[in-house]
């Protein structure tokens, strides 16, 4: 029930009357002719309504959240605490650089940390989400070729095991997407790559480790071939949590990347807060970085704008990035340090391999059984589908009934009936075992009563939804009857 439907007459709290403003300068077609439709509820009723809704929310603070390729790790409260200090929290976007030297120093240090972690030489913190970071990265590749007069390079190569947003990003930037396959062992098909490389190649977008959860072993060969063809390498940082302190994209031959701070650096996801997708580049692309960036002149920290970076692809927002998120990421990096970040990747990888081994031990089918998992892995439920008629969706709905958020389903598309599972480093053995036992229990039920799975979930406020109707008859705005 939405709060509007709870209105029962005049229950709204009293509001002190205010002086009416002058509306003479407002066009008449923009003036309201009817009273706004607002819920009439007492303050206590409003508090209760939203508190009850929050209890129905599924979040990392209350449950295991093994959503593959999303890195749903715990967000340390210390980062929230210090990012909420008055000097950070009350900073106005238009405040002068001179008055926010502490904030700028933190951002400057974060830029340097990202350079060191990724092996790149230039960083912009301007992108306000991972997708915007992707856009900035591909836009820089396009700007690089156009500055060289290479206008015919309009193709981006995207493996079928790349992160799902990559093709969309290339399209938004006005480039053509050329898909290449992944081999049965999880590596890119080099022969297929050779066939599509040429004078129209602008670059290739890769996630490494890939979305199938394995490290691309031929990355050095791929980098050499793409560069020899005149293209650039884009690194999607979706899976960077697997290799912090172990390998650097810049050392692999990548020219540009974006990081998802809401994944790798434990800042809040989605409804928990805005994102941040910094971009990092090598010397080839530094002149194209989006502004603003933080620089240092005469021992003072300054904003670098268009006049300082004349070939920049420009601004991505009105202000200077999601600084509240960036400060949280800075604090996370400062708390862990280089050794701590490396250990985080080690434990994330250990947890993924533990879960993969245990599920294999319990008889589940691993998509790439001969490869070590990076920070995530894939279980294919194709045998369960063929034997009992149950799907990955059925398993997912039953997992939610058992207090575990479902892993990513049906992605990557090249593995049938798949669950992409990523435990992250912040989970312990008990929570992972709870998930494993839930999977075993659900499969046991499927053997005896597959229809039971078709009706799940049973213990949630909303039962199984009609996905087809939801897609065809989208209704996301409440209107009075």
From Swiss-Prot:
<dbReference type="InterPro" id="IPR049316">
    <property type="entry name" value="GDC-P_C"/>
</dbReference>
<comment type="function">
    <text>The glycine cleavage system catalyzes the degradation of glycine. The P protein binds the alpha-amino group of glycine through its pyridoxal phosphate cofactor; CO(2) is released and the remaining methylamine moiety is then transferred to the lipoamide cofactor of the H protein.</text>
</comment>
<dbReference type="GO" id="GO:0005829">
    <property type="term" value="C:cytosol"/>
</dbReference>
<comment type="subunit">
    <text>The glycine cleavage system is composed of four proteins: P, T, L and H. In this organism, the P 'protein' is a heterodimer of two subunits.</text>
</comment>
<comment type="similarity">
    <text>Belongs to the GcvP family. C-terminal subunit subfamily.</text>
</comment>
<feature type="modified residue" description="N6-(pyridoxal phosphate)lysine">
    <location>
        <position position="263"/>
    </location>
</feature>
<dbReference type="InterPro" id="IPR023012">
    <property type="entry name" value="GcvPB"/>
</dbReference>
<dbReference type="InterPro" id="IPR020581">
    <property type="entry name" value="GDC_P"/>
</dbReference>
<dbReference type="GO" id="GO:0016594">
    <property type="term" value="F:glycine binding"/>
</dbReference>
<dbReference type="Pfam" id="PF02347">
    <property type="entry name" value="GDC-P"/>
</dbReference>
<protein>
    <recommendedName>
        <fullName>Probable glycine dehydrogenase (decarboxylating) subunit 2</fullName>
        <ecNumber>1.4.4.2</ecNumber>
    </recommendedName>
</protein>
<dbReference type="GO" id="GO:0004375">
    <property type="term" value="F:glycine dehydrogenase (decarboxylating) activity"/>
</dbReference>
<dbReference type="GO" id="GO:0019464">
    <property type="term" value="P:glycine decarboxylation via glycine cleavage system"/>
</dbReference>
<dbReference type="InterPro" id="IPR015422">
    <property type="entry name" value="PyrdxlP-dep_Trfase_small"/>
</dbReference>
<dbReference type="InterPro" id="IPR015421">
    <property type="entry name" value="PyrdxlP-dep_Trfase_major"/>
</dbReference>
<dbReference type="InterPro" id="IPR015424">
    <property type="entry name" value="PyrdxlP-dep_Trfase"/>
</dbReference>
<keyword id="KW-0663">Pyridoxal phosphate</keyword>
<dbReference type="Pfam" id="PF21478">
    <property type="entry name" value="GcvP2_C"/>
</dbReference>
<keyword id="KW-0560">Oxidoreductase</keyword>
<feature type="region of interest" description="Disordered">
    <location>
        <begin position="1"/>
        <end position="26"/>
    </location>
</feature>
<dbReference type="GO" id="GO:0030170">
    <property type="term" value="F:pyridoxal phosphate binding"/>
</dbReference>
<dbReference type="GO" id="GO:0005960">
    <property type="term" value="C:glycine cleavage complex"/>
</dbReference>
<dbReference type="InterPro" id="IPR049315">
    <property type="entry name" value="GDC-P_N"/>
</dbReference>
């Amino acid at each position: 029930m939405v709060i509007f439907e709870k209105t029962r007459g005049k229950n709204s709290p009293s509001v002190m009357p205010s002086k009416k403003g002058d509306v003479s300068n407002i066009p008449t077609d923009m003036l309201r002719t009817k009273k706004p439709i607002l819920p009439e509820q007492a303050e206590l009723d409003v508090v209760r309504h939203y508190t009850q809704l929050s209890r129905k929310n599924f979040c990392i603070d209350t449950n295991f959240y093994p959503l593959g390729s999303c890195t749903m790790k715990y967000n340390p409260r210390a980062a929230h605490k210090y990012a909420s200090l008055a000097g950070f929290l009350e900073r106005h976007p238009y405040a002068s650089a001179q008055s926010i030297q502490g904030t700028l120093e933190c951002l400057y240090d974060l830029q340097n940390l990202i350079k060191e972690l990724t092996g790149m030489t230039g960083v912009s913190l301007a992108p306000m989400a991972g997708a915007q970071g992707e856009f900035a990265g591909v836009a820089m590749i396009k700007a690089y070729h156009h500055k060289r007069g290479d206008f015919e390079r309009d193709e981006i190569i995207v493996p079928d095991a790349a992160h799902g947003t990559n093709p969309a990003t290339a399209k938004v930037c006005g480039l053509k997407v050329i898909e290449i396959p992944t081999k049965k062992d999880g590596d890119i098909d080099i022969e297929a790559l050779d066939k599509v490389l040429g004078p129209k190649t602008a670059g290739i977008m890769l996630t490494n480790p890939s979305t199938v959860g394995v490290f691309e072993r031929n990355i050095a060969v791929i980098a050499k071939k793409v560069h020899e063809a005149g293209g650039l390498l884009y690194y999607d940082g979706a899976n960077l949590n697997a290799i912090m302190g172990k390998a650097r994209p810049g050392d692999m031959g990548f020219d540009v990347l974006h990081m998802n701070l809401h994944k790798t650096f434990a800042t809040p996801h989605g409804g928990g807060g805005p994102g941040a997708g910094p971009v990092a580049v090598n010397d080839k692309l530094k002149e194209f970085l989006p502004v603003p960036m933080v620089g240092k002149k005469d021992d003072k920290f300054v904003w670098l704008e268009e006049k300082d970076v004349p070939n920049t692809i420009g601004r991505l927002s009105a202000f200077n990035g999601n600084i509240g998120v960036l400060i949280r990421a800075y604090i996370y990096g400062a708390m862990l340090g280089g050794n701590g970040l490396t250990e985080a990747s080690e434990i994330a990888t250990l947890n993924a391999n533990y879960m993969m081994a245990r599920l294999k031990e319990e008889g589940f089918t691993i998509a790439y059984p001969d490869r070590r998992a990076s920070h995530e892995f894939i279980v294919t439920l194709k045998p369960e589908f063929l034997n009992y008629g149950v799907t990955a969706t059925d398993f997912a709905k039953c997992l939610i009934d058992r207090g575990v958020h479902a892993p990513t389903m049906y992605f990557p598309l090249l593995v049938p009936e798949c669950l992409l599972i990523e435990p992250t480093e912040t989970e312990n053995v008990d929570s992972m075992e709870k998930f494993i036992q839930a999977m075993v229990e659900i499969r046991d039920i499927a053997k005896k009563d597959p229809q039971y799975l078709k009706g799940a979930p049973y213990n949630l406020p909303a039962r199984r939804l009609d996905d087809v109707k939801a897609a065809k008859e989208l209704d996301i705005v409440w209107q009075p009857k």
